[in-house]
Amino acid sequence: MAAENSKQFWKRSAKLPGSIQPVYGAQHPPLDPRLTKNFIKERSKVNTVPLKNKKASSFHEFARNTSDAWDIGDDEEEDFSSPSFQTLNSKVALATAAQVLENHSKLRVKPERSQSTTSDVPANYKVIKSSSDAQLSRNSSDTCLRNPLHKQQSLPLRPIIPLVARISDQNASGAPPMTVREKTRLEKFRQLLSSQNTDLDELRKCSWPGVPREVRPITWRLLSGYLPANTERRKLTLQRKREEYFGFIEQYYDSRNEEHHQDTYRQIHIDIPRTNPLIPLFQQPLVQEIFERILFIWAIRHPASGYVQGINDLVTPFFVVFLSEYVEEDVENFDVTNLSQDMLRSIEADSFWCMSKLLDGIQDNYTFAQPGIQKKVKALEELVSRIDEQVHNHFRRYEVEYLQFAFRWMNNLLMRELPLRCTIRLWDTYQSEPEGFSHFHLYVCAAFLIKWRKEILDEEDFQGLLMLLQNLPTIHWGNEEIGLLLAEAYRLKYMFADAPNHYRR
């Protein structure tokens, strides 16, 4: 039945994006054994398709053999309890997945790349603590050369995660000494923030290329509109807003067990453990309880949208930044039970209010049918068709729809595609830009897509393109890569934002 629904869905013009439950990316590699099992069953059939018919059939084969997000129930527990899933052996599934990827690469007949454009990639990885420039340990027995896509396709038992680098580019114990330029920037921030009335325009200008870690919490509070510019009013404002938030907790949180709120709370309760599942900080019960309260109270106070999957990701950058105000060591491995109750309450309330300010600007992304996202995806398609027609035509040739990969980019603000440290750096700029999370994000997505044009054009079938676009190799990215991405996005905005006819046919 699920297969029939899949075929019917893809053949009609879908207006509703539906569920977004299966999400993969830089932080969530595609390790679903059910998917790989379906692929290997049909591999022999794909090889027998004549070349002239391969283009037309590839999409329908993918649709027939893939369970859509729309066909999967919200309750993961029901899915995992099914007899078919219980009979799967994880080792066999992973081995099968590796074989599928190897066969897929052999299908593509291409000129051999020069050694200068290839990179050594380890076959087996282990989790290590490192800075943002840390290199992964390499198994000496594997000396084969692989292209950048294969970095993510090797499917190790545990994904590659340089732990410290995933959250921040600095930490108290291992950060390199600050340069003279960095010290000068930090001093300028401190002068701005300590003035009686902070010049917010100047603060935005200074924050665009990134905010120093030491002053990021207060800078984010100011840029989001949570704190007033006047220093004398800040303490009272924080006290009042924090008390107001916990007033909401007392008033509404007990209603989570009422019938008309049970579905909302149940979905939040399911989604919280999925939030950055490989970072120890977010697996602590106390942290998950904080996230549940934040998301439930926001959903109750915004009935037009309620809770939508993906909003849970938007809490994490604020939580990490405000936690770093009290923790100088490795944040992601820090045990929050070591903090006082007052500190935890401050972090929770500030995360709630700043997330609320963010969502106020993009709430049409999460109302019924998510019209904001559909509009942005269409705008991205039009923009890419003008700035890189070759990539756009490549998608059309292999029947790849922008909604199939860019929906997640808009819904999660690229958080599933980038390590968390990169998201925090990206949000420094988003909060410095007018309508950064809504308008400027479109140009960041366009620049992000074109960044991978070579890898995109190298893929010559629908499956390969979707695997690439849903699992882009950004795990080693840091401030430098984000800076280049933002510079390109700014160039695109300068060229097209005030001249819409430039990207209209």
Swiss-Prot record:
UniProt entry tagged with the keyword Lipid biosynthesis: no
Feature: compositional bias, Polar residues: 129-146
Assigned GO CC terms: Golgi apparatus
Mutagenesis or variant effect for residue 114 to E: No effect on ACBD3-binding
Taxonomic superkingdom: Eukaryota
GO molecular function, one term: GTPase activator activity
Entry keyword annotation includes Acetylation: yes
Residue numbers bearing the N-acetylalanine modification: 2
SMART domains, per database record: TBC
Coiled coil ranges: none
Positions where Phosphoserine occurs in the chain: 58, 116, 154
Key words, A-Z: Acetylation, GTPase activation, Phosphoprotein
The Rab-GAP TBC domain, residue ranges: 210-434
Segments of this protein annotated with the region Disordered: 105-146
A Pfam family recorded for this sequence: RabGAP-TBC
Function: May act as a GTPase-activating protein for Rab family protein(s).
Binding partners and assembly: Interacts with ACBD3 and ARFGEF1. Interacts with YWHAB, YWHAE, YWHAG, YWHAH, YWHAQ and YWHAZ.
Protein name (record): TBC1 domain family member 22B
